[in-house]
């Protein structure tokens, strides 16, 4: 019978987006379908918003983003002045980030 320790082996690692040049990949997605094309369009819209000094960028967060490994991406967006405000569900801030701050990990 499987035990808890059998499932808690692979710790989720937060991606450091600055270590990857994803621009060519996201640009190529413009000619794809469904979510890939949507990601390209969203990236272009965000780029336009960031360049517009009169535009306020509000980042909305919901779901298991931090426990899925995206905490550093959000952190980098904040540190690089890519967002002006954040609207988040409580689970992201309280549960996911707080547990990691206490030294717990996501698997």
Feature annotation, model-predicted:
Residues 2-107:
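Metallocofactor- and cofactor-centric catalytic cores in central/energy metabolism, strongly enriched
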